[in-house]
């Protein structure tokens, strides 16, 4: 059975036809006065270019995002569908973007060969899911119900904490009030935002006045939510918008220590489309349990 995977920019993966991996863009829009310039996240704008723009942006410049259109999904599926028996689609978490709905519309047109997953995950979690699906397919006969159940179990074992100090994108996107933003900046708080694959929703859950305190709160939260009796951590990752190697290494090592060296922590750059909303100097810590 020839199978391809179709993802979008939030996966931070690059298209690789030899690996049967295809990528659709999500969009970043830079608005300067009345002028707008649109970029394809991960295609013609990378994280370094975006963060440089955000750092040097004059007052009044805004950055926003836009979804993949129904037509784009349809055209991409049409372009590869004859080469495969099945295309597995993993779009951005439906709780974060309505892009998922466009994928589902197209799925109905190719329902025998296009299966869109309700994964409710983002970033490197998508790469982990693809890897695990490949193993599952080697040991199980494909069925929609079977794969959906596998994905449901996968996402219920995933969680993350996002650490934010630059509140401007959150205010611009209507996710944070100006008053709360002022308080956070005045007291130099680290804002903690939780993400659980169980729901796929982002929620403000705490704040801390130091990075170390924020990291401890994050690990305590993830352990409480994800660790069950006789269950261990399986994978962990640090996703960062920062390019200071030493700083990232210190943050990563602190998480390794807080987890008592229970799991290796990989390091990756955050996708540009997510950074548009989290701002500069933001980072995230992701966990998956067994």
UniProtKB/Swiss-Prot annotation:
InterPro entries (alphabetical): DegV (IPR003797), DegV_C (IPR043168), DegV_domain_contain (IPR050270)
Function in brief: May bind long-chain fatty acids, such as palmitate, and may play a role in lipid transport or fatty acid metabolism.
Gene Ontology MF term list: lipid binding
Protein name: DegV domain-containing protein MG450
Keywords: Lipid-binding
Keyword check for NADP: no
Domain DegV: 3-289
Traits of the deletion mutant: Probably essential, it was not disrupted in a global transposon mutagenesis study.
Superkingdom of the organism of origin: Bacteria
Family matches, as PANTHER family: DEGV DOMAIN-CONTAINING PROTEIN DR_1986-RELATED (PTHR33434), FATTY ACID-BINDING PROTEIN TM_1468 (PTHR33434:SF2)
Residues that, per the record, bind hexadecanoate: 65, 97
């Amino acid at each position: 059975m020839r199978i391809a995977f179709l993802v979008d920019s939030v996966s931070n993966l690059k298209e690789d036809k030899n690996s049967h991996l295809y990528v659709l863009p999500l969009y970043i829009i830079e608005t300067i006065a009345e002028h707008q310039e649109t970029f394809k996240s991960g295609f013609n704008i990378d994280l370094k270019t975006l963060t440089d723009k955000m750092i040097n942006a004059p007052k009044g410049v805004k950055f926003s995002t836009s979804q993949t259109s129904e037509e784009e999904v349809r055209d991409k599926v049409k372009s590869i569908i004859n080469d495969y028996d099945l295309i597995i689609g993993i779009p951005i978490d439906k709780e974060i973007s309505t892009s998922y709905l466009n994928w589902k519309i197209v799925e109905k047109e190719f329902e025998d060969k296009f299966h869109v997953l309700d994964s409710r995950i983002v970033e490197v979690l998508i790469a982990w899911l693809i890897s695990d699906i490949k193993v599952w397919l080697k040991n199980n006969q494909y069925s929609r119900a079977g794969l959906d159940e596998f994905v449901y179990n996968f996402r219920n074992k995933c969680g993350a904490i996002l650490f934010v100090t630059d509140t401007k994108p959150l205010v611009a996107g209507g996710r944070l009030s100006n008053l709360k933003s002022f308080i956070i900046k005045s007291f130099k708080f680290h804002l903690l935002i939780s993400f659980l694959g169980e729901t796929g929703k982002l929620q403000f859950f705490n704040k801390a006045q130091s990075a170390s305190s924020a990291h401890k709160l994050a690990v305590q939260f993830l352990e409480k939510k994800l660790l069950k009796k006789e269950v261990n951590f399986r994978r962990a990752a640090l996703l960062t918008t920062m390019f200071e190697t030493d700083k990232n290494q210190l943050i990563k090592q602190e998480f390794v220590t807080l987890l008592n060296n229970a799991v290796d922590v990989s390091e990756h750059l955050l996708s540009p489309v997510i950074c548009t909303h989290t701002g500069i100097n933001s980072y995230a810590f992701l966990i998956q349990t067994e």
